[in-house]
A protein has these predicted regions:
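N-terminal leader/signal peptides at the extreme start of proteins
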Residues: 1-10
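Short, conserved structural patches
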Residues: 2, 41, 46-181
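Membrane-water interface of alpha-helical transmembrane segments
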Residues: 9, 13-16, 142
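Alpha-helical membrane and juxtamembrane elements of multi-pass inner-membrane transport
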Residues: 9-12, 25, 66, 169
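Alpha-helical hydrophobic helix detector
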Residues: 13-33
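Transmembrane signal-anchor/signal-peptide helices with a preference for the extracytoplasmic
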Residues: 33-39
């Protein structure tokens, strides 16, 4: 049979657990958010590299923006990827929640629309003039460099961490390869 002292100790342990459990849960979900951020950062780096490989490969049919977008989509494991302005400009705008934007440009592109850019598209694309807020298309040829950039908007699930980061973290990864054609 329990004594009065045993019951008091059990009650004290229950109160201590009630005080500590919110902190433990916050730490647990914070670790989950950090794990998600590391996973997505690695994923977008890999997707940018694979997209750049597709953009520069020599084959019977030269690659297009659609080929690069398809490859990046397949590497992003169900995360939606779109290309609102495939040839840029690469701006500081934020993609929709938990989705990514793809850009295929010259290395170190400017943040403004380019009317006459250096080669900034896969060789299978057709030349096109600047259109609204999108840069002109100038297909690469003759061993030029292309940069594939993926910008991803990660929305965090831990409320306290999300408030500290304005509810999201925008990650960006880029790969620069030289064309083979």
């Amino acid at each position: 049979m329990g004594t009065r002292r045993d019951k008091a100790q059990r009650s004290q342990a229950l109160i201590e657990f009630a005080l500590v459990s919110p902190v433990l849960l916050l730490l647990l979900f914070g670790v989950v958010d950090i794990g998600r951020a590391i996973f997505y950062y690695d994923t977008i780096n890999h997707a940018a590299r694979e997209g750049a490989r597709v953009a520069v490969r020599a084959s019977n049919q030269l690659p297009t923006n659609s080929d690069v977008l398809g490859t990046v989509n397949s590497q992003m494991l169900g995360t939606p990827v779109t290309a609102p302005c495939p040839q840029g400009p690469v701006t500081g705008a934020t993609p929709p929640d938990n989705s990514a934007w793809l850009y295929i440009t010259e290395p170190n592109p400017p943040g403004t629309v380019e009317a006459t850019p250096p080669p900034n598209a896969p060789g299978g694309e057709y030349s096109a003039n600047a259109n609204g807020s999108c840069s002109a298309v100038n297909p690469a040829d003759g061993n030029k460099q292309l940069q594939v950039t993926v910008r991803f908007n990660l929305v965090l699930i831990t409320p306290v961490v999300a408030q500290a980061t304005a509810n999201h973290i925008v990650m960006s990864a880029a790969a620069v390869f030289r064309t083979e054609y």
